[in-house]
């Protein structure tokens, strides 16, 4: 890919900042905090990748993923699911998120909240690079 990729980050404010820091200069980021804002961006801008966190828009990541994959103009955009900030979810639920995300059309689920910071950054950057290929 020659042009700088445009990455839509769908996350609560703190997680969006963490992702931008983690991903560095991998792309141009557009950060949104609600599903409505995300679809406005998708309607008016070319997006190469969507990265969403579990807690996006009051924990609507899966709902957003299903909506994106059901929208003809956006279904082709790779969608990467993640958990950036540890929360109240039980380990068993978080462990099932990867399967749920992939079943709904995501390319992967990266649980960076469980990883040491250096490994988390490496894993997320690798997942983004792979998703953009």
Label each residue range with its predicted role.
Residues 33-49, 53:
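Acidic, metal-coordinating helix/loop segments flanking the phosphotransfer/catalytic sites
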Residues 44-45, 69-76, 104:
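Conserved phosphotransfer cores of two-component systems
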Residues 21-23, 41, 100:
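Alpha-helical interaction/dimerization surfaces of two-component signaling modules
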Residues 129-133:
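CheY-like receiver
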Residues 12, 33, 85-127:
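Output/docking surface of receiver
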Residues 13-33:
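Two-component/phosphorelay signaling modules centered on CheY-like receiver
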Residues 51-72, 79, 83-85, 89-95:
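Conserved phosphotransfer microenvironments
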């Amino acid at each position: 890919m020659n042009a700088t990729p445009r990455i839509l980050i769908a996350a609560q404010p703190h997680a969006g900042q963490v992702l931008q820091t983690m991903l560095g200069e991998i792309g141009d980021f557009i950060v949104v905090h609600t599903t409505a804002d995300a679809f406005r961006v998708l309607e008016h801008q070319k997006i190469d990748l969507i990265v969403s966190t579990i807690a996006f828009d009051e924990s609507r990541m899966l709902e957003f993923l299903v909506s994106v994959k059901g929208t003809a103009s956006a279904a082709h955009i790779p969608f990467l699911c993640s958990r950036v900030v540890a929360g109240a979810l039980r380990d068993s639920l978080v462990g099932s998120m990867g399967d749920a995300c992939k079943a709904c059309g995501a390319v992967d689920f990266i649980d960076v909240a469980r990883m040491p910071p250096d490994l988390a950054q490496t894993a997320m950057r690798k997942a983004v690079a792979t998703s953009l290929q």
